[in-house]
Amino acid sequence: MTDYGALVISPGLVDIHVHLNEPGREEWEGFETGTKAAAAGGVTTVVDMPLNSYPTICDAATFDGKLAASEGKLHVDVAFWGGLVPQNAHNESVLDELIERGVVGLKTFMSPSGIGDFEQSFKPDLEAALKTLGKHQVPLMAHAELPSDVDLDPNADPRKYATYLATRPRKWEQVRTLRDAHLLVFSARRSLASALVDDDDS
């Protein structure tokens, strides 16, 4: 037996929510630095998000560009999410090609993503795309926020965490329409409990 002191020995970790922003925004985080950092932390597989690179990964051509940008730069195993936006949600052949290229699923936002070329999706977009996702048996990963009227304090200090939390109230997560999906970035414990309930309203 070998004593490794304070070191931890474990299987390689998997991180399914990583932003490797090549091509287009390498200064944020690229394949080289992102996958080296993952390896240094014991993460042996990452799944890259379809936004923050430019262009965003919403069709076969942009996915091919992403793969080309990654050549020779990967230090761990990398898989990819494709993007679901209003521009491709109703085009079955575009989604077919993207999924058949090898993305592990599709990622969408139901609130503004903060990236201009990755627009938020709405209920008709999701309903159209879910048929294609079901056909291919791949998941939808959604920022499942449904914005409602929020009264924000114009004098709140933008540097405080409480000010940020006020922009994402619990009720945004509690109003929901559930399908087979990964729901991202829960911050309200009650919302998670609600999402796990299988009732007539889900």
Predicted regions and their residues:
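Active-site mouth loops of central-metabolism enzymes
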Residues: 16-29, 52, 57, 76-90, ...
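Alpha-helix-loop-beta-strand connector modules within alpha/beta enzyme cores
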Residues: 10, 59-77, 125-142
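Short coil/turn connectors at secondary-structure junctions
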Residues: 4-5, 9, 43-44, 73-77, ...
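Hydrophobic faces of well-ordered beta-strands that scaffold small-molecule active sites
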Residues: 12-18, 46-48, 78-82, 104-108, ...
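Histidine/acidic residue-rich metal-binding segments in metalloenzymes
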Residues: 90-202
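Active-site loop-to-helix "anion-binding N-cap" substructures in soluble metabolic enzymes
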Residues: 49-75, 84-88, 94-97, 108-115, ...
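Metal-associated gating/positioning segment near the N- to mid-region
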Residues: 4-73
